[in-house]
Amino acid sequence: SYTDRTRAYIKIQDGCSQFCSYCIIPYARGPVRSRNEDEVIEEIKKLAKKGFSEIILVGIHVASYGKDLGNTSLENLLLKADEIDGIKRIRMSSIEPMTLNKSFVDKVKVSKKLCNHFHISLQSGCDETLKRMNRHYTTAQYMEIVNGLRTAFPDTAVTTDIMVGFPGETDEEFQKTAEFVKKADFADAHVFMYSQRRGTPAAKRPDQIPPEVKEKRSKEIIEIVKHSRESFLSRFIGSTHEVLFE
């Protein structure tokens, strides 16, 4: 029920075709299936008429929206939603970094309603670990994306997900992640410990990390993020911003 709410969640797709080595979703939910663009826009219009002023586009793999349809894309959907009367804010749920390339950013930066908040999944700040995870980017590519967003959207909040204790993660690899998290200076992050998902390649690896090591690493990253979050929020002390009440 959305009674007395100002924010609504719009599911725009289901499924995933990424096959990260730790994730069961592609096996459980199947390949990418995008909703018809006109259907999504019509739902947003109806919600706007009911008084909702903020929408969040969600899905299993939001970045892949439209790729199976061939006649639209995530950026096109965003810009069409931007034109709907009554909608004041548009957000996206977690998104893959390589979607937010220069072409995407150049198209959507004209939006008057897209919030200055991008939750860009990192998982690890170590290239060797990312490769074992079957993530399709490097830390250098990720940082380039983040810097591009911060240039196009001043004072944007970049948040992320960080997994510690992935199978085979050495002390050296973890330190690379810790240093990268400091460098990226995230506004916030969801830090979590790797857990096995039966049926995934990562779960079959023999080099699982002991629970006590994962817990120690998690606490270290959480502490780093705590400082970067405080630093980000301190920028806005003394400034005035528009808010939505519900």
For every predicted segment, state its role.
Residues I120, D161, V181, A189, ...:
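Hydrophobic, well-ordered secondary-structure elements that form the walls
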Residues G86, F186, P201-R205, I209, ...:
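Conserved N-terminal phosphate-binding loop of PLP-dependent enzymes in the Aspartate aminotransferase
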Residues E169, K183-F186:
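Contiguous mid-protein beta-loop-alpha structural module that forms a pocket-lining wall or clamp
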Residues S73-L74, V108-K109, T177, P206-I209:
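Short, hinge-like loop/turn segments at secondary-structure boundaries
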Residues K49-D171:
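Conserved SAM/AdoMet-binding glycine-rich loop
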Residues S1-Y65, S103, V108, F118, ...:
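Proteins enriched for Cys/Gly/acidic motifs involved in redox and nucleic-acid/cofactor modification
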Residues I237-E246:
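Structural detector for short beta-strands of small beta-barrel domains
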